[in-house]
């Protein structure tokens, strides 16, 4: 896979990995988890290419604040993942034809939002470990958020503790 740069309509630069693009092949777009980047999933992408006999185009974007992307990131001011959804929407719209959207953790939620916002563009959705809450947990989170109580999520704390360097890479 080759590293490329996507420039948004506002001039922000996003780094992404892309396989050898074949016109007319299916498009698979992957969104990584918080604290990760596209490189993390290269083994998965290679297995997908083999499964589809190399007849699939794979795109994996480094989301803002991650990997080699230079787009402005303000993690302290982040209130939702909407900015990542907006970035993803513009990215998939730049790809010719329908896309299969996929992601891991936060990335799977972004993929799901894109599928719901763009049903004519997103043909399939594949989610790995989506961050989903049941109705009661969701209500508790919204109340705590509204009251500004315990704003730190355990899942975010766990993501913040992830290693940034892996000796084998």
Report the location of each language-model feature:
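Flexible "cap/lid" loop of the alpha/beta hydrolase fold
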Residues: 116, 125-157
């Amino acid at each position: 896979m080759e590293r490329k740069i996507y420039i948004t309509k506002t001039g922000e630069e996003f780094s992404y990995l892309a396989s050898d693009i074949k016109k007319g092949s299916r498009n698979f777009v992957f969104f990584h988890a918080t604290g990760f980047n596209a490189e993390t999933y290269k083994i998965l992408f290679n297995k997908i290419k083999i499964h589809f006999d190399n007849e699939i185009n794979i795109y994996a974007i480094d989301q803002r604040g991650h990997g080699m992307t230079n787009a402005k990131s303000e993690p302290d001011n982040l209130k939702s993942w909407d900015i990542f959804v907006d970035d993803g929407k513009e990215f998939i719209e730049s790809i010719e034809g329908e896309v299969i959207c996929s992601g891991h953790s936060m990335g799977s939620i972004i993929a799901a939002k894109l599928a719901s916002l763009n049903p004519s563009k997103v043909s399939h959705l594949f989610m790995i470990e989506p961050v989903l809450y049941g109705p009661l947990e969701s209500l508790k989170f919204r109340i705590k958020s509204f009251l500004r109580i315990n704003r730190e999520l355990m899942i975010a704390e766990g993501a913040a503790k992830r290693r940034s360097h892996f000796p084998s890479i």
